[in-house]
Amino acid sequence: MEKKAKESLRRYKKAARHSATHSSSSDSTSDSDSGSSSYSSTDSEQGVGGVGVGVGVPGGAGGPGGSGSVHGHPHTHGHGHHPRSAERHHRKKKSSRRGGSSSGDEPSSSRRKRDKRDHVQKKLVAKRNHIKRKLKEARLKKRAAAALSGHVHRSLSPTTRAKLKKLAERKRLRAASKEQRERDKLRVVQRDRERDHHRLGSSRSPPSSSTTTTTKIRIHQDIVGKRQKSPGLGSGLGGGSSSSSSRMHHQLMSREKIIIQTRARGRTPSLERERERERERERERERERHDLSLRERDRRDRERERAEREAARDKERAEALARCQERQRERERLAREKLRRQEEEEGGKRGGPGRDLDLPPYGSRERSLDTVERERERERSGRHVRDKRELDPYEREQEYLEERHGHGLIDEMRRYRRRDLSPMPEHYAPRLRDPRELYSEEERERAYKRAYLDARYSSREREAWLEARELRERELQGREYRDLETEDTLYPDERERLIRDRERDRERERDRERERNIGPRGDFRPEWEREWEEEGAGGGPGGPSGTPGRPGGFVGGPKRGKPPAHAGGGPPSQQQHHSASEPDWDADERERERERERDRERERDREDRPDTGGGGAGGDRPSIKNEPAWLEHDQREKPRGWQQQSSNSGGDWRDNDDAPPAPSHPHPASPHHHVHPRGERGSGRGFRRGGHGHGDHGERPGYRSHPPPLMTLPVQPPGGYSRGFPHKRLPYGSGRDGAALGARDGGLPGSSTFLKKHTHAPLVSPTQTPLLNPLLNAAKPNAAAQASAVAAATTAVAAAKAAAQSAANATTNPGILAQVSKLNTVCIKQEDASEDSAGTPELGAQDSPTQSLNLNQSLSSEGNPVKQELIRTSAVEGELSEISDSDDDILNKTDKVRPKNELPTETEQEMDTNADEVKSEALHIVAGHPIKGEEGDEVLDFEEISDGELEEDARHKGIGDALGVDWQGLIAETRQQASDAQAAQQGVDRGTSAKQRWQPYRVLLDLGISFGMAGEGYARCVMEEARQQLLQEKEQGQQRELDGDEEPPAKIPSPLLDYREFLASQQQLEPLACVQMGLRSAAVERQRLVGNVCGPGSRALSARQDLRLRRQLCGLPARECEFPRSVPIVGEGLRNLAMQMFQRRLLDVK
């Protein structure tokens, strides 16, 4: 044995170099170097290594004599060399320790000895590894040979196998428990780390030293020939001791792979490390507390600085406000001095009321107003000493308020001042009850911040609206709220009319100023103001007027907030060069001069016109309520030169009894060219679009050129078409417009309770004027007769207007005409369909004969049946005689202007004679059945209307034609009838609820049922049952209607044939659901075609409709199907073959 061991050692020397490098790599995967699995200690390794020389090889040779000792049977045979080798090993260790301690000073001989011992030790270790490898190879060869020879059972005895199995099981359980402990330890460490992480709140990753890595070691080892650390290793040599029998027997690995998890360097943190970590956490918390305190201190510092800045800013604001107030007081003082010097220069001569209206327009202090009054009294009485009562006028506030209610002059002065320099309307309170509420401190400060704003425009609109509300409240005191009509509110078109009256007076003053060559503030005017007159010459009254509308060529005109551009040498805008709170003294001088001229003009008017029936602008009409004095100073609609009338009319053509003259703008080159000034199309800021009729602008009343036929171009009705005020969109206005006309022209005191409310713009349409003007001419010699005739005519027109919506088609459909004549006592409510102008006739769509027809229907229904035919025939003959047979003449026709001196026709004379009896009835009709408006008694929005909205409205306009036919109304009626008939034909009658429509029997009748899917008998039974249920439901509905349990649904013409009955009848029931549906759709189409031919409201039978009917009745397709000629015609035989195949397929499906 020793020889073989020596041989193996010699073999090892040859491969020493290789084993020195290879053993650490290849054998590390085995159990030799793992240290924790194979061998328990260095002593055992050394001992086994020493013994292995003499023991291991016989097992490798596989001799029969060494079978018992090789495989580790627990025979306690002594081992002779083992104690000596152990002793030698301990000595070696002691000498190596001793040599390690005194390595510096020991002699070289001992160092050589130590080196030699180390070299021998290394050789022994290498030899041990080599022998292990050789043993493994031998085992593998032996196992392979045994497997080939089939004698495996000879290698191990049953008891050996049982013991090995038990040891392997114990080893496996030990490894499993160790792995479980490792896992538990890892889980505990991870939990501690997470707890620390959450407690610190830091996002730092845990230190890498505490991480645990799991190393997987794969060990392929076999049990056969495995050494055990037991005393039985040297049993083959005989003899031995049982001293090491108490050692733990380490069973090496089994055949299968076992994964051992070890901790790579990361151990459980020690106590010192835990303390260090805790100290680190404490330092972190301290730093966080310090940062929080720093942040809090910074925040407090910032808040203190902000408060100091706010206090400094408030102080600066207060100082600036005090400075501004001081400057204002200085200005007021200078203004009073200037007024006093001017009056001294005039020799004490007092001016007209214009002097008070031209006070410095600063409305924040009423004390200045009161002081000026007292200065005038002081100058009149000659005293020049101020007392304390004079210096503090707020003691006289109650007296001032009483005087304001009683004294019209102070009232007008306050209105003028509040209008001129009030802030923007959105900063207003809804009502101004006290003079001190005019300017709050906040608004005064805002005025200094917004010096660039021109405050006149929006404040003027606001003031007009406030005055209108005051007028309404004074008029309607003591009346029931429900008695008020919806038109009682003063809308922007009324304001526009009032403001235009005022503007005409201003324009006259400016013209007189220009005649005297009084050039205010230099002759320079900006280019847009100088050229505006010429550019706007052909554009109607949108040009030089004060509305911010565009003239003809001035496309980029201002929309909002732009000061008015003045004509001629008039003054530029009053507040272009100073802030909203500073007055313009030159403008006030000019205003004073104009007021004096205005007073002289009024005096001349009173002398020239002793009769005040017309109620001129300067006449004695008692309408300071209706047209307050501040309206004379608005700079809005400046009229053209052709609107300046002679002085006997007071400068307003509407006060005359004559029709206005023709406009100065030239006729357009084409009759399709529309002459629509910008102001009429809807200029103005916040005003209703086109709130003034053509007559207001002096346009020739009969002249209205039409657009090309059936085009949807915008045609503005004279009553205006405004989205902002939809309930004002009646055709040509209704009773209120006529009443307003009468109130303006007649000014009757007797009818003032009814007519005073309607201060709307006189919506004079081109169709109205030929009807009403001869009435005025006929009654002109006698003022009383004129007033009664005008009132009667206007109220009659108001009553007749209510029927104008459905009577617009009177000339085309006599049946509708007969129906309309019955509508004398009920005013037609304007439904929501008027949003699409369905019932709103356009300008060209309702000519004067149609209006006279409507009027005469309302007259004749109240007791003039004999005259009705005469009136109707004469009107229709006159209408037809004006139209020639030429299409061009029809399309290019314009309304004829009736000359002023033309005698009234017999129609109007009859109207005149019947005017008195009609008047009260018409008043009763209009008052008893007010026209339904939409919600809202007061409109508080002053939102301007943009061009985009105008174009959008234009797209919604109806279709107007030269023949006066309301095509839009006809189309709407036809659509309604068609939808009703279609709903009835489809069985969806208006009394049917959604729940009823989704009943199973209705669904089955609508969809059909397939015989192939359900079976023929069952399908017929189901359809018949559904049909019976439908009939039963109809009978129940009729019974409920008879009993009066529910309100009867809208009457719809019953279909000629119920398609459900047709579908479910036993003879017509087809086997396929698609065929049933096809039959139903064919029946519905046929019924629709036939039902539209006759019946109420049906159209005349056209050629197209006739052809469709014939195609339907003959079974032809609805449209002509044109096949290309290249398609071959299918032969009869081929067609029959295809049909047979189709029927066979159907039979197969069944």
Curated annotation (Swiss-Prot):
Q: What is the protein's major site of localization?
A: nucleus
Q: What happens when the gene is disrupted?
A: Female-specific lethality, associated with sexual transformation phenotypes. Hemizygous males are sterile. Sexual transformation phenotypes resemble other N6-methyladenosine (m6A) factors, such as sexual transformations, Sxl splicing defect, held-out wings, flightless flies and reduction of m6A levels.
Cross-referenced InterPro entries, in alphabetical order?
Answer: Flacc
The record's Gene Ontology biological-process terms are:
cell differentiation; mRNA modification; mRNA processing; regulation of alternative mRNA splicing, via spliceosome; RNA splicing; sex determination; sex differentiation
Biased composition, Basic residues: where in the chain?
11-20, 72-97, 110-144, 162-175
Task: Cite the record's tissue specificity text.
Answer: Widely expressed during embryogenesis but shows enrichment in the neuroectoderm.
Extent of Low complexity compositional bias: 21-44, 98-107, 202-215, 851-861
Compositionally biased residues, Acidic residues = 879-889, 905-914
Cellular compartments annotated: Nucleus
Point out the coiled-coil segments of this chain: 122-147, 269-347
Q: Does the keyword Coiled coil apply?
A: yes
Q: Which residues lie in Pro residues bias regions?
A: 660-669
What family is reported?
Belongs to the ZC3H13 family.
Additional notes on this entry? Was named Xiong after the Chinese character for maleness.
**What is the name of this protein?**
Fl(2)d-associated complex component
Gene that specifies this protein? Flacc
